[in-house]
Amino acid sequence: MKLLVTGGAGYVGSVCSTVLLEQGHEVTIVDNLTTGNRDAVPLGATFVEGDIKDVADNVLSSDSFDAVLHFAARSLVGESVEKPDEYWQHNMVTTLALLDAMKRNNVRNIVFSSTAATYGEPETVPITEDAPTHPTNPYGATKLSIDYAITSYAHAYGFAATSLRYFNVAGAYGLVGENREIETHLIPLVLQVALGHRDKIFMFGDDWPTEDGTPIRDYIHIRDLADAHILALQSNVEGSHRIFNLGSGEGYSVKQVIDTCREVTGHLIPAEVAPRRAGDPAVLIASSAKAQSELGWKPQRTDLHTIVSDAWAFTSQLGDKAHSASRG
C-alpha cells in the first residue's frame, strides 16, 4: 500500500513507519519537526517537511495514496491547559484540513491516533470503549472532537476509519525511543535519573487507594501499538468509524515502575514523594477485548521488565553517544 503518515518523525509515528516499511509498504512522512526529529525518519521513507494543513493537498495529489495514518498532534496535557488555542489549532483545525484534503483527493481510508485522555477520570476499570467520555483537559477534548469529526466524515463521505485510543505507550523499537525536549512520561523520566540527567524522580502521592499507595497505569509496548495500527489499516470498512482501546490490560504502580527500572539499570534511582496532582486517577487500565476480538490484535510484550529493558537499551545508548532520535 502507498501510505501517508503524518507526524512520522515523532516517537509513535516513526516506529509505525519503520514497521510498515519492513512489511513492504511505501511510506511518505509529513512532519513539521516541531516536536519530531528528522533523524527519526526511517530509511526508505519519503519525507516532506511542513505542516499538514498546508501541504496535504499537494502531497495527496502527487501520488495515488491508499490510506493515511494520522499521528501529528500536540500532546502535552499541562501545556494544553496553558495554551488551549494552540491545541485546538494544531490538533482540531489541522485534522479538519487533512480530512478535507483526503475527500478532495479521494483518499478515504484513515487510522487516527486518539488517546485514553478522551475518557477523563473513569467511573470503572478496566475502561471499555463504551465508557463515558469526559476529558479533563483541552488535549483530550481536541482528540475527542476529532473522533466525532471522523465519524461524520465516515457517514457522509464513505470514509473507512479507525481511532485507536492509547494508554501509556512505552519501550523502544530499534533505534527509536522516547527522547522529548519536554518529558512527562514516567519511564523515560526514571531512566533519565539512572543516567544522571536528573537528581531524582518524584512520586505524586503515596496514599492512593492502591496496594502500595501509588497510582497504577497500563503500559503498552510501542511495537505492539504499531501492530495494532497495521491491523486496523487492513480491516477498515467503508462508511464506518471504529474505536478501539489499546493497552496491555495489566496495571503497574509508580513504585513498581521505579523498582523495575532499578533492577534493569543497576542504578539506585532516588525517589521522593510529592503532593498529589489534581485530576490524577488512582487506577487507569484498559480493556482491549474489542481490539483483540475485532482486529485479532494481541499484545506480545506486556511484561514490565521487557518494556523497561527495551526503553533502557535506547536511552542508555542515547546518553552514551549523545545523539538524538525521536523527540515526538
From Swiss-Prot:
UniProt-listed Pfam families: Epimerase
Lineage top rank: taxon: Bacteria
E.C. number(s) listed in UniProt: 5.1.3.2
Catalytic activity: UDP-alpha-D-glucose = UDP-alpha-D-galactose
Cofactor(s) in the UniProt record: NAD(+)
Keywords: Carbohydrate metabolism, Galactose metabolism, Isomerase, NAD
UniProt GO MF annotations: UDP-glucose 4-epimerase activity
Enzyme class at the top of the EC tree: isomerase
Residues the entry annotates as binding substrate: T115, Y139, N168, H185, L186, F202, M203, F204, R217, R277, A278, G279, D280
Catalytic residues as annotated in Swiss-Prot or TrEMBL: Y139 (proton acceptor)
Residues reported to bind NAD(+): 11-12, 31-36, 51-52, 71-75, 115, 139, 143, 167
One BP annotation, GO: galactose catabolic process via UDP-galactose, Leloir pathway
Pathway(s) the chain acts in: Carbohydrate metabolism; galactose metabolism
Database matches in InterPro entries: Epimerase_deHydtase, NAD(P)-bd_dom_sf, UDP_G4E
PANTHER family: UDP-ARABINOSE 4-EPIMERASE 1, UDP-GLUCOSE 4-EPIMERASE
Family in the record: Belongs to the NAD(P)-dependent epimerase/dehydratase family.
Protein purpose: Involved in the metabolism of galactose. Catalyzes the conversion of UDP-galactose (UDP-Gal) to UDP-glucose (UDP-Glc) through a mechanism involving the transient reduction of NAD.
Protein's name according to its UniProt entry: UDP-glucose 4-epimerase
Source species of the chain: Corynebacterium diphtheriae (strain ATCC 700971 / NCTC 13129 / Biotype gravis)
Lineage: Bacteria, Bacillati, Actinomycetota, Actinomycetes, Mycobacteriales
Gene: galE
